[in-house]
């Protein structure tokens, strides 16, 4: 009997050990993107073809040169294509691994860097930013502005800007060029860069100068999309002792296996940068000049020195899908934990209350789909998203376990409704 019990014990240990190893392997596989047949991951291959057809229509009508798109369902890549052209004159196909200027999609990555340091106990989210960047001490708020000569008067701010204010775009900072008229003029006079193609400038120098300028409104009282995440990028540099580029590479890109994400591309990848287009007076595709709104088209290929946390990155849709899968996995990807589940929860929930009256809200670096927003689009409540100036969009839907991105490169683009149609097409193809 003792021998029998011993045998059963050994078998039980072996079974338990084998089960644990199998479970660990399955967990690891689930955390890594795998390309698969749509039918094996709950998608209709036939209905996915509607995406090809819709994008091709936009190409044929000369509304866009081309687009890349990817859909991930529960870690399985069910759609991953480039459609149309990179160079429409030469009929060069747009490859699915093309590198795109992702502009404001940089914000979520910078916000992640901030939360990594927050988890290390380097600061609290309600700390004053002036504790780390003294130039933001004793802020003032714009009172009156003279359009004739850009002079202005100010009033004292009721309180200082916090790190949380910056993460939620409630600090009172605005954007050059695309911001409010008065603040755009004020920033232009002070030569404050938007973050894109800040030739010859460095992040620290420009953020310190920004700190001396007035705010659009009192901190914490309104939602204003602005240079907040550029300030956060410099916070990462100050606290970590690394450049933002180095921090991204060491703490996010390398652990996740994001091999094509950079502020400035290595020369070996220059030829993969997608061609940027504009449109003519009839809203048809047109070759862009060497610069658009003062931004050189080839700025990712210039080995620059300004690392804009708000808009400086270039990347591929595959790399960004990895980044988003990490969030759907609760902060982990392929066995590498980047964030805690708690930080992921905080980043992907409404952090601004009713400060913004639209159907969407804002978390810590992401737009958030509310119940009201879900009533107006296929995305489920709790989905999180954003996009980029040059025509890129992404979202993740935790309820359906969907990640989707569509990328074009065109400014301006009067046919941005392609993004809305893509959202519909992603969900209609679910089995």
Predicted regions and their residues:
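Short loop/turn microsegments at loop-to-beta-strand junctions
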Residues: 65-67, 78, 390-393, 402
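Extracellular/periplasmic catalytic domains that process cell-envelope and extracellular macromolecules
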Residues: 63, 93-94, 124, 154-161, ...
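Short, conserved phosphate/pyrophosphate- and ester-handling motifs at nucleotide-, phospho-/glycolipid
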Residues: 44, 107, 316
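Active-site SXXK
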Residues: 55, 75, 100-129, 133, ...
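Short, conserved catalytic-motif segment at the N-terminal edge
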Residues: 29-32, 36-102, 122-124, 141-146, ...
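Bacterial Sec-dependent N-terminal signal peptides
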Residues: 1-27
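Short, surface-exposed loop or secondary-structure junction motifs
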Residues: 140-381
């Amino acid at each position: 009997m003792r021998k029998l019990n011993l045998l059963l014990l050994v078998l039980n240990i072996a079974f338990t050990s084998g089960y644990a190893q199998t479970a660990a392997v399955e967990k690891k596989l689930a955390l890594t993107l795998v390309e698969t047949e749509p039918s094996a991951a709950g998608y209709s291959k036939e209905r996915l073809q509607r995406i090809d057809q819709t994008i091709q229509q936009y190409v044929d009508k000369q509304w866009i040169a081309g687009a890349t798109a990817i859909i991930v369902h529960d870690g399985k890549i069910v759609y991953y294509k480039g459609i149309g052209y990179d160079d429409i004159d030469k009929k060069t196909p747009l490859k699915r691994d093309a590198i795109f200027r992702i502009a404001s999609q940089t914000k979520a990555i910078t916000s992640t860097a901030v939360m990594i340091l927050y988890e290390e106990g380097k600061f609290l989210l309600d700390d004053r930013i002036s504790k780390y960047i003294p130039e933001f001490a004793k802020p003032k708020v714009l009172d009156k502005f003279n359009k004739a000569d850009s002079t202005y008067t100010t009033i004292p701010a009721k309180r200082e800007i916090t790190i949380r204010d910056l993460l939620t775009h409630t600090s009172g900072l605005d954007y050059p060029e695309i911001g409010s008229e008065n603040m755009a003029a004020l920033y232009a006079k002070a030569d404050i860069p938007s973050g894109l193609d800040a030739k010859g400038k460095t992040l620290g120098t420009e953020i310190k100068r920004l700190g001396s300028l007035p705010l659009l409104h009192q901190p914490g009282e309104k939602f204003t999309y602005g240079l907040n995440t550029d300030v956060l990028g410099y916070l990462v540099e100050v606290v970590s002792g690394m450049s933002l580029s180095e921090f991204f590479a060491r703490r996010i890109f390398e652990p996740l296996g994001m091999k094509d994400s950079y502020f400035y591309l290595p020369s070996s990848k220059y030829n993969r940068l997608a061609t940027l287009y504009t449109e003519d007076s009839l809203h048809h595709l047109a070759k862009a000049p060497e610069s658009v709104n003062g931004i050189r088209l080839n700025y990712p290929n210039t080995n620059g020195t300004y690392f804009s946390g708000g808009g400086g990155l270039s990347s591929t849709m595959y790399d960004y899908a990895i980044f988003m899968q990490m969030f759907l996995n609760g902060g982990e990807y392929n066995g590498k934990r980047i964030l805690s589940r708690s930080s992921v929860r905080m980043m992907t929930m409404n952090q601004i209350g009713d400060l913004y009256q639209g159907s969407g809200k804002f978390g810590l670096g992401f737009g958030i789909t509310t119940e009201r927003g879900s009533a107006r689009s296929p995305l489920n409540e709790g989905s999180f998203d954003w996009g980029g100036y040059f025509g890129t969009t992404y979202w993740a839907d935790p309820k359906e376990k969907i990640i989707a991105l569509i990328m074009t490169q065109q400014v301006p683009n009067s046919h941005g409704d392609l993004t809305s149609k893509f959202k519909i097409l992603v969900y209609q193809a679910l089995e």
